Design a protein with these regions (language model features):
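Amphipathic alpha-helical segments used for helix-helix packing
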Residues: 84-87, 99-126
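Solvent-exposed, amphipathic alpha-helical segments
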Residues: 14, 18-25, 72-75, 158-165
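Short, basic, alpha-helical segments at the C-terminal edge of helix-turn-helix-like DNA-binding modules
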Residues: 63-69
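Helix-turn-helix
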Residues: 14, 18-56, 60
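Hydrophobic alpha-helical connector segments
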Residues: 60, 74-104, 155
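N-terminal intrinsically disordered/low-complexity leader segments
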Residues: 1-10, 193
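Hydrophobic/aromatic-rich alpha-helical bundle segments in the mid-to-C-terminal region
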Residues: 119-127, 140-193
């Protein structure tokens, strides 16, 4: 008996969802097809009914992981402007976010990986960076445009870089200090704008 299109779509979605989590946790090369399909409860042989290649899976997984970040921001804190920015900074630069790359921001998780990806991966990453820059610009209003753009670039770079560094060091105290000092500096930045 064959599989219905609805079941195939459901399976495809499950595979991509798991891969989106794994790509944030393990990077672009950290996903094995056999293990992924097993985790999805499907056979290894069924992979090619869903994807033309492993690269196609990675492209979809990265797009999904990045898109989930957009949804999180949209459903996030309801404060506006600078207050919203401060709330986002506190959540983003938390030990909970640092400790959960699989459910965290894909821009941070893939910051040292995206350049190795194919065209779709880099385009998706670029779109997400531009989206986050625009969101930050909207939150830190009140300055002439060039300064807002510069400050949003600084803020996004600091957020992503701090999380990447905090995840990478093997000294818990240093990791927490990276997060807290960056949060303090970013809040100071918007307080003076």
């Amino acid at each position: 008996m064959g599989t219905s299109q609805a079941d195939k779509d459901k399976h495809h979605d499950r595979i991509v969802a798991i891969a989106a989590t794994r790509v944030r946790e393990r990077g672009l090369d950290g996903i094995g097809v056999a293990d992924l399909m097993k985790e999805a409860g499907l056979t290894h042989g069924g992979f090619y009914r869903h994807f033309g290649s492993r690269a196609d899976l990675i492209d979809e997984a990265v797009e999904r992981a990045l898109g989930e970040g957009t949804k999180r921001v949209a459903s996030g804190p309801k404060a506006s402007g600078k207050n919203r920015f401060r709330t986002i900074v506190d959540g983003y630069l938390s030990s909970a976010h640092r400790n959960s790359p699989g459910s965290g921001c894909a821009v941070a998780a893939l910051s040292s990986e995206a350049w190795r990806g194919g065209k779709r991966v880099r385009q998706a990453y670029t779109r997400q960076v531009k989206l986050y820059l625009a969101l930050i610009e909207d939150m830190i209003d009140g300055r002439r445009r060039p300064a807002v753009r510069r400050d949003s670039m600084l803020a996004l770079s600091a957020l992503v870089g701090a999380v990447a560094m905090a995840r990478s060091v093997d000294d818990e105290q240093l990791s927490l200090e990276i997060l807290s000092c960056t949060a303090e500096a970013l809040k100071s930045l918007v307080a003076h704008s």
